[in-house]
Amino acid sequence: MKNINRRSFIQKSAFGLAGTMAVASGLVNLSFNPASGAMIDTVQLGETGMKVPRLALGTGSYGWKKTSAQKKIGEEKFVQLAQHAYDRGVRFFETADMYGTHEFVGKAMKKVGRENVTLLTKIMVYEHQDWYKPESFQKSIDRFRKEMNTDYIDILLLHCMVNSEWPDEYKRYMDDFSEAKQKGIIKQVGLSCHDFGAMKIAAENPWADVLLARINYNGAKMDGSPQDVMAVLKKAKDNGKGIIGMKIFGCGDLTKDEQRQKSLEYVIKSGNVDCMTIGMESIAQVDDTIERIMKLANS
């Protein structure tokens, strides 16, 4: 794949207006569980040897053209949000070059201490119309580290793989990832899956340490039915991959209390998803999500 337009990307990654409006009219205005003081626990990320918080602070809700919902709240509010999440155990930040949040994450890590945080970012390796063209891997990784005030990246993913040919199409990048991993610049490598075929290949591919996959009970904004996707994630987990869930709330389609609860329960109780990333924009959302997750994890 050499180019993808905005419409195609939205269809694949589900950063659409409908999802934005669902959140704007739903999740943001719902009542939330009050904070009890519960802390997010840590879990093993597959067989990578890495322990991570069960919940990551996502920074790319409706991310496109170097912006996202988290970027739009502004640097000061984002850093406050990240500090609050950190204080409650969410010491795992998920970002990407496309979201435009690298520098916000860098400011947050400077405040809480880089050594205390797991950092995941993603690199886009194909063109987007006239506004994005991939740099060389070395130029990108140097820029990422500068933007985020870090010497190393815990998890680096190929962003938005949309077909089963990705190991052939992006072998050069995969080799670059592996070389950087050998040098200690990256600790774990993998991909974010936005296609069922891409996910099936990733589950068996020995190169990938980590899979970021869309999963919820409903099938909203997913790459297949919940049953089919969960079967692939089980295979990936059996193969030692670290599995990170995304689109837990269906990119805004599953915002009612009972929907959020059911989706979290489905993912946590499956045993096939190690941890998850959720794009939160307020302290109330952070507290509510932590309360729900930890009650389920401890039940």
What are these regions (language model features)?
Residues 116-129, 159:
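A short, structured active-site edge motif that brings together acidic residues
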Residues 148-164:
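Active-site groove signature of glycoside hydrolases
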Residues 70-84, 133-147, 194-201, 259-266:
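Short, acidic/polar
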Residues 38-43, 102-104, 137-144, 195-199, ...:
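Alpha-helical scaffolding within the catalytic cores
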Residues 2-117, 266, 270:
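N-terminal binding-site loop/beta-alpha segment at the start of enzyme catalytic domains
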Residues 47-49, 106-114, 145-149, 203-206, ...:
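Acidic (Asp/Glu)-rich catalytic clusters
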Residues 61-75, 123-135, 254-256:
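Active-site mouth loops of central-metabolism enzymes
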Residues 161-299:
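Beta/alpha (TIM)-barrel catalytic core signal, keyed to glycine-rich beta->alpha loops juxtaposed to Asp/Glu
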